[in-house]
């Protein structure tokens, strides 16, 4: 059975780079949890544009502001919402090289563990 992968993208004010970050993994993962923590820039607009283009792959949530204590709770909620075998953390300004994401996905899909 093929292993499935979710990308966790928990962001705030990453409108300048987040499109590139998500696009760098979108064709290699089954789902992207794209949660915004109170952006005041164009991050949410970018998220909705990506969701329009990939409606079944993007789960966008306006999570709301987090602080040092509640950041870990948001991450845990992302884990709880993940229904795939694996997940990767994707920062809002993290752009994967094609070869790198292909290598990671290959390792995941060829691993014996779930």
What does each model-identified segment do?
Residues 91-95:
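The conserved acidic donor/metal-binding loop of glycosyltransferases
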Residues 9-34:
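Short, well-formed alpha-helical segments that are part of the catalytic scaffolds
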Residues 99-114:
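Conserved donor NDP-sugar-binding/catalytic core segment of glycosyltransferases
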Residues 49-55:
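Short, conserved SAM-binding/catalytic segment
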Residues 2-6:
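Extreme N-terminal starter segment of soluble prokaryotic enzymes
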Residues 65-81:
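Glycine-rich, basic loop-to-helix element that forms the pyrophosphate-binding segment
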Residues 87:
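Short aromatic/hydrophobic "clamp" motif used to bind/position activated sugar donors
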Residues 35-49, 65:
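A conserved acidic beta->alpha catalytic loop
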């Amino acid at each position: 059975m093929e292993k499935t992968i979710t990308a966790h993208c928990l962001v705030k004010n990453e409108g300048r780079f987040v499109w590139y970050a998500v696009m760098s993994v979108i064709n290699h993962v089954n789902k992207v949890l794209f949660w915004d923590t109170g952006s005041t820039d164009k991050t949410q607009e970018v998220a909705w544009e990506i969701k329009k283009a990939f409606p079944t792959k993007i789960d966008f949530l306006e999570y709301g502001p987090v602080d040092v204590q509640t950041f870990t709770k948001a991450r845990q909620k992302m884990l709880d919402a993940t229904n795939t075998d694996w997940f990767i953390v994707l920062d809002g300004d993290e752009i994967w090289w094609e070869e790198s994401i292909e290598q990671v996905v290959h390792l995941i899909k060829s691993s014996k563990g779930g």
